[in-house]
Structure formats: C-alpha cells, structure tokens
Amino acid sequence: MNILVADDEEMIREGIAAFLTEEGYHVIMAKDGQEVLEKFQDLPIHLMVLDLMMPRKSGFEVLKEINQKHDIPVIVLSALGDETTQSQVFDLYADDHVTKPFSLVLLVKRIKALIRRYYVIEDIWRYQDVTVDFTSYKAHYKNEEIDLKPKELLVLKCLIQHKNQVLSREQILEEISKDVADLPCDRVVDVYIRTLRKKLALDCIVTVKNVGYKISL
C-alpha cells in the first residue's frame, strides 16, 4: 500500500511518514505540488495526504489535475479551518479535511478508515455473469468454472483495487510482485489481460493507449 504524503513542512511530512511506516505502509514523500504530480508517474499511489498551501503548485491545483486521471482517497491538511476552504476542498472530491495542528494518532485512524472504504475487496467479486472467489482463486462464467492461472486473477484483483485508475504494465507487475516470484517482462500483462477478456468476457477492462489498463466499474 503506497501512501503519498505531501507537505512543504519537513517536520510534518516526516512525522506522518514515521507513523505510517510503523503501521506497515510504504510512504512516498513530496515537498511541493509539482513533485506530487511527478510521483504519480513513478508509482501507483493508493492514498494521498495533501497539504493545501505548498510551493510550485498548491493543493487545490494538484487536486484538479489528479482528479482527471486518478480515483484515489485524499485527505487534505490545512491551517485554514473555515467553512469556505472546507467547501472548496470537498468540491474537488477530497475525502476528508484535517485542520492543523492535528493528532497524528487520529490522522492515521482516518487514513485506515479510508483504506477500508476504498480497498477492502470482498472474497467474492461479481460482475454481470462473472463470479470470482479470490480466496480459492476460482472463477466462474455463466455458472461454469473457468480455468485461470493465479497470476491472471492477481492482475484482475489489482485492477479492481484501483478501479477507474489507469495503471501501466510496470505498475501492475509491481503490485502483484509481492505475491509472485520471478516475474517476466511487462508485456506478459497484455497476455493476462487478453485471457481475462476472452475467458470471462470482461468488457470493463479498458486499454488506455500508450499508458496501460484500467477497470471501469
């Protein structure tokens, strides 16, 4: 689980990162708005903690750009706790607003709550005539069991966890690497996707030219 922490104040940035690292999350840090956008090109980001007032690009500007390409939970940090600021934040589809100063313990609890809301997948996933059991790694299409490899189902699970978010082949492989050893070149993702589409008729898996794949749900 990759969490991006963006704040131009080093003490705040590193304090949040330390707490999250202790909880087992992988933390990426950014000190300004432009760096935030660059980080999104390097790694799949699952959740972002974003300060509003940053150099180069403000949190408002970052939110506008991120919303065009990614669907991830965002917690906004701000020294401004007035109704107008909070209204603007939620208008840009942020999930939560935390006013500085704040409790790190409570912030981490808010983060965990958002992760549960966004990313906890039921053991059984259903889409039209498809049923997938991610516990037993079995899939059925029109009540008939379909022969699929665990790697193919891991790719499907990865896309579901990032629903409506475009992932590159490299990002998909990185996501499933903790479960699969000795991964081949990234083009094997094309084979996995082709198999999922063919055997399960998953028209919800969309190819984004020159970028990668996403699942539209």
UniProtKB/Swiss-Prot annotation:
Q: Which residues bind DNA?
A: 122-217
| Phenotype of gene-disrupted mutants | Expression of CbpA down-regulated at transcript and protein levels. Significantly increases nasopharyngeal colonization in mouse CD-1 strain intranasal infection model at 48 h and 96 h post-infection. Significantly increases numbers of bacteria found in the mouse lung at 96 h post-infection.
Entry-linked InterPro entries: CheY-like_superfamily, OmpR/PhoB-type_DNA-bd, Sig_transdc_resp-reg_receiver, WalR-like, WH-like_DNA-bd_sf
Q: Does the keyword section mention Ubl conjugation?
A: no
**What is the purpose of this protein?**
Member of the two-component regulatory system HK06/RR06 involved in regulation of target genes, including choline-binding protein CbpA. Binds to the promoter region of CbpA and directly activates transcription.
User: What intrachain disulfides are recorded?
Assistant: none
**PANTHER family, per database record:** DNA-BINDING DUAL MASTER TRANSCRIPTIONAL REGULATOR RPAA (PTHR48111:SF21), REGULATOR OF RPOS (PTHR48111)
Q: What is this protein called?
A: Response regulator RR06
Signal peptide residues on this chain, from the entry's feature table: none
GO CC terms: cytosol; protein-DNA complex
Under Gene Ontology molecular function, one entry of this record is: transcription cis-regulatory region binding
- Provide the record's note on post-translational modification: Phosphorylated at threonine residues by StkP; threonine phosphorylation enhances RR06 binding to DNA and may also increase expression of CbpA. May be de-phosphorylated by PhpP.
UniProt source species: Streptococcus pneumoniae serotype 2 (strain D39 / NCTC 7466)
